[in-house]
Amino acid sequence: MTPELRHMLRDDDLNHEEQKQVLELAIKFHHDRFYKQPFAGPQAVAVLFDKPSTRTRSSFSIGVAELGGYPLVIDKSGSQLGRGEPVADTARVLDRMAYGVVWRTFGQDRVEEMAKYSTHPVVNALTDDFHPCQILADFQTIAEHRGGVDNLKNQTIVYLGDAANNMSNSYLLGGAVAGMDVRVAGPYGYLPRPDIVADAKRIAAETGGSILVTTDAKEAVKDADCVFTDTWVSMGEEAEYAIRSKPFWDYQVNTELMALAKPDALFQHCLPAYRGKEVTAEVIDGPQSVVWDEAENRLHAQKALLTWLTGKARGDESLLA
């Protein structure tokens, strides 16, 4: 197998078959947390944070360790990036020492710049535009509740709320790659960028999926297999909650809205969740919620992704399955 450097910067960096490989590997890691250890040595993986994190920090830190490696966790305050060092300079230095870079940051251009100067895999752990690691965990969760990865193509998934945010973008692209029927619903002024919708529709045409963007929450949820939402207010906007939340109340996931979905529909939320706002307690703490499975699967999906990317970079086919 010829070595091939690959990064995961946005959800369509994997094609349909590659996404299936990663998800199937994630399920194997769920059954055996030490299934493979590509970083045995230990080899270091740099895990950078420009934003606060609970699930991403813990899942990548524990995940790299379980893969046999050493997670070098660096916060913005402890990095020269926080003092204005060019991304390219940081990338060149880390590339000499670490076997991969995971970065939770703001602009998408920053992870793209990191990848440009890296000879090891770079993973987007969240930017303002995309959250591909979360989507892999979410799809793993659906697969585990629906009889396997092959059944993802039969699923209708719905995202409600701020349809212009990174989660909406990633559901559109990742769902299209999976061949799902993807629906996103949000108020006017909070709909996805036309270029992302166009990319999703192009991919869906190849995989047998479909894309619907609407302002009608009830239309979106009708007969859905899985309903997703996210907080209405992003990090740093908490002081504006009362103002920012006004357009979103019609998109709250409650029992009335869930009743429009299929009777066995799943509910997922990337967390943190604000009960009584984007979702009611009856839903997130109810029998249709698989939120805690979803949160755990961040660990397994990210380990699978790092293993798969490392296998590609090293030309080691044994790490791909």
Map each language-model feature to its residues:
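Positively charged, low-complexity intrinsically disordered leader regions
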Residues: 1-58, 62, 130
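Phosphate/diphosphate ligand-binding glycine-rich loop within oxidoreductases
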Residues: 38-143, 275
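Phosphate-coordination loops involved in phosphoryl transfer and adenosine-cofactor binding
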Residues: 39-45, 152-155, 264
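Glycine-rich phosphate/diphosphate-binding loop of Rossmann-like nucleotide-binding domains
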Residues: 50-65, 144-229
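Short, conserved loop/helix-junction motifs that constitute active-site signature segments
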Residues: 151-152, 176, 256-264, 286
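Rossmann-like adenosine-cofactor binding region
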Residues: 201-281
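Adenosine-phosphate binding glycine-rich loop
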Residues: 264-265, 270-321
